Amino acid sequence: MIILIIQGVSLCFLIVAVVLWGLYFPHPSPLIRRRLPPRARWPEAQIRKWLRRGSFQSGFLNYFYRDPERIPPVGNSILAPADGLVTSVEVHEGIRYLVIALSFWDVHVQRSPVSGSVVKVESKGKEFMDGEGRGFAFLMEKPCPVQQRVVISTDAGEIAVRLITSLAARRIETWVREHDAIVRGQRIGRILLGSTVVLELPESVYLLVDVGERVWAGETIVAQEMNSA
């Protein structure tokens, strides 16, 4: 009798597993989802399907909105404003541009790379586009994508952080205002879903990261003044 019960329970479990596998195919079944790393737990194709539908699985939203504490390294070096992959490092008309692409699985809270005073928070662009920001770095008007540009005055000159939208990420939250005094590593805003952050620096600073490297907001040192190198 006990053997029959065990066999029955096992059969029921197998049926449930098969049904869930079929319902969620080709995406992970809820039975194994928690055991998978984030990229496998929520594949890009599944996230884009949710985007088209306008609704998301609650577990992914809880993961996406995470906002871990960050401890900035000691010193006055310039920190990464966002989590992500460095996709472009260029100089144009005296400005050094560092482009960071955020994926769906990165923390989407942006942080100030330096301490200083906010001199400007401006909205730019009129369109939503896809891409990694390389072609957007030097554009300030149409066809530049919708974005928020936070300009910070420092002893080394003005530094700007550009939060750029995409077709997927159409909302930006900016948490600082003009004349605010901010500190290095402070939260300044958030882009909803994967997009791009551009850090604008004076040409005189010395970059410490290159294309292909991953960076973390408020923790990774990306540059420093030449006289500090």
Placement of each model-derived feature along the sequence:
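Contiguous, well-folded functional domains in the mature portion of proteins
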Residues: M1-A229
